[in-house]
Amino acid sequence: GVVFQDFKLLESKTVFENVAFALEVVNTPRHKLRKRVREVLRLVDLTEKAQSFPRELSGGQQQRVAIARAIANKPSLLIADEPTGNLDPDKSKEIIHLLERINEEEETTIIMVTHDVDVVNDHKKRTIALDQGYLVADLTQGGYISRNE
């Protein structure tokens, strides 16, 4: 699964339909599709927004819809490209905690790309730092990256 910084939601579809789309393209039977969409909307805490359209949601809610769609097919790997880039610090923390829950509950490996040093420093997982395309740090137990590195 892939999560983008700018959400990439289908504006003419509801939250439910956006998440269902990922299952429809792989011909998931309708009863399984509805069940899985409800499961992931519960996981991302958007059950009450199922019939809302993306334009009616906050940035944090839109990112949670994008995450729900990305995990609908139970991928073993989720790539999150700047998932907090368009969010304020509080919403960023919520998204990071959600990704950690998905890692644990869905048993999904998550690769997150970010330029936000605070997100990296708050996240106690393996951290790989690149500079100009070169590996400059590989902190296998997580840890802090100073703003000067």
Regions found by a protein language model. Name each.
Residues 13-20:
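Short coil-to-helix segment of the ABC ATPase nucleotide-binding domain corresponding to the Q-loop/switch region
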Residues 32-44:
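ABC nucleotide-binding domain "signature" region
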Residues 53-57, 61-63:
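Conserved ABC ATPase signature
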Residues 67:
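Hydrophobic anchor residue at the start of the ABC signature
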Residues 74:
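Conserved catalytic motifs of ABC-family nucleotide-binding domains
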Residues 78-81:
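Catalytic Walker B motif of ABC-type/P-loop ATPase nucleotide-binding domains
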Residues 89-91:
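Helix N-cap at the start of a conserved alpha-helix in ABC-type nucleotide-binding domains
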